């Protein structure tokens, strides 16, 4: 199924709306292009609804959050919901500040997300307020290991059931789960913690099923 959907993305090259982190905006645009889609980075409230209308998916990333883009995220997210577009949330740094935590929770209340992608501390913060985010990184105490993997998978599935979204928790071991099943990916490498933004690239390509 994935191979067919990926081929369809390359064939139809859908436009993807990104309201994203300025730190990695160029990398995210290039990732969308590498997947065969086409990126547009638009975060002014005056145009985000128009831009979302002509796109096939929306990626919201709160990494460089400010009061102006909060409004834009809400407008674009609600418009995407009306249009039936998939919407991805990357709650970067949720738990590190009250603004980030409050904004991520408000987005969850007001926008229906198809996928929620974060590190374990960010996702724990959204689920229960119990995450211990270290800036924009997961705290060592939260990290997913082979020893706590079963409980982490159960947590991801429970949060997916609660939000009706696919939950992707990234780290040394990635977990991708819906309410019924989960997949674990062991492709992490210690060097990934030495550069910024590798996790953000996962969320940029988010087109709807182009078989429609």
Question: Could you say what each language-model-derived stretch is?
Answer:
Residues 189-204:
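Short glycine/threonine-rich catalytic loop with a Thr-x-Gly-x-Asp
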Residues 207-212:
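Single conserved hydrophobic/aromatic residue that forms the stacking wall/gate
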Residues 36-79:
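Active-site cofactor/substrate anionic-group-binding motifs, chiefly glycine-
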